[in-house]
Regions:
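An internal, acidic/charged active-site-proximal segment
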Residues: 156-255
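A generic secondary-structure signal
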Residues: 52, 84-88, 172-179
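Active-site-proximal, Lys/Arg-enriched surface segment
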Residues: 36, 67-146, 242-255
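Electropositive, glycine- and tryptophan-enriched low-complexity nucleic-acid-binding patches
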Residues: 59-65, 124-183
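Short, conserved acidic/polar surface loops in the N-terminal third of protein domains
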Residues: 111-118, 149-150, 197-199, 217-218
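Generic alpha-helix structural propensity
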Residues: 41-45, 58, 62, 72-80, ...
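Gly/serine-rich nucleotide phosphate-binding loop at the start of the catalytic core
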Residues: 1-68, 74
């Protein structure tokens, strides 16, 4: 076993340390199969991945029982891992103008042939929704040296077999809003709308949107004469061209 493999096993041992005896060993073997890439060949199938990793039938059954009936919680493992990273002191959070970014996004394990599961998530490679088990991920953005490395903070799993991507997105945003600290800003990809972020009451955020996006102020313009305004003034973050004419961006309120 190489030095890197030994160090990986030592970290896994520390992560599962709070878990009851027996279950901790089974979870360690399961996580080792995940890290080794054995789940890729079996498309996420647990028994196939464990068999590919060289575990015996008895060990495979023990891992399966620990996964679905063991006395453990994913947040215990995440907390233990974060404490290990903090004690190691190599990972450092990214800070921009005294703000710490926290990434919030969705991902999925694609299982097109999984029986009894109807939930679908958008697959960017296929450019359409495909059957898969969706997850919401919340992670601190940091780096080890010059390499950017996210530090997992929370996982939001789909609750039901038919849960929609929109519902999972909403629960993930609500979770992120509760976990966001005073000096943190949530970072979102283009898959989430500004309305969803506001409904989750996230106080500070940066969200990727279309280059031609526009919005409206939440206050009505000052009444001068004529018909009264029903909507706020249009705000255009970026200038754009239309029919050969340049539409200027809205002036900033402050810098």
């Amino acid at each position: 076993m190489t030095t890197a493999s030994q160090r990986t096993v030592q970290v896994l041992e520390q992560i599962v340390k709070p878990v009851p005896l027996g279950t901790n060993l089974a979870l360690l073997q399961l996580m080792w199969a995940i890290i080794s890439g054995a789940f890729l060949t079996g498309r996420g199938a647990i028994h196939t991945a464990l068999k590919e990793s060289g575990f015996r039938s008895q060990e495979i059954r023990r891992c399966w029982c620990a996964l679905w009936a063991g006395q453990w919680h994913i947040y215990e493992l995440i907390k233990q891992f974060r404490e290990l990273v903090s004690a190691d002191a190599q990972w450092q959070p990214r800070i921009c103008a005294d703000w710490r970014p926290v990434s919030v996004d969705l991902t999925a394990i694609w299982r097109p042939r999984l029986q009894g599961w109807s939930g679908k998530m958008f697959n960017r490679l296929a450019d359409k929704k495909k059957t898969g088990i969706g997850y919401g991920l919340i992670a601190d953005i940091g780096a080890i040296g010059e390499q950017r490395v996210p530090l997992l903070r929370a996982i939001v799993r789909g609750e039901t077999a038919g849960e929609s991507e929109t519902t999972l997105q909403r629960r993930t945003l609500n979770k992120a809003a509760k976990m966001l600290k005073e000096d943190e800003v949530s970072i979102h990809d283009a898959g989430v709308s500004l309305r969803e972020i506001h409904e989750a009451r996230i106080p500070r955020f940066v969200a990727r949107q279309r280059s031609n996006i526009t919005g409206r102020r939440n206050t009505l313009p000052l009444y001068r004469s004529g018909r009264r305004h029903k909507f706020g003034e249009i705000v255009r973050p970026l200038a754009r061209k239309r029919a050969g004419k340049v539409i200027a961006a809205s002036p900033t309120d402050c810098v």
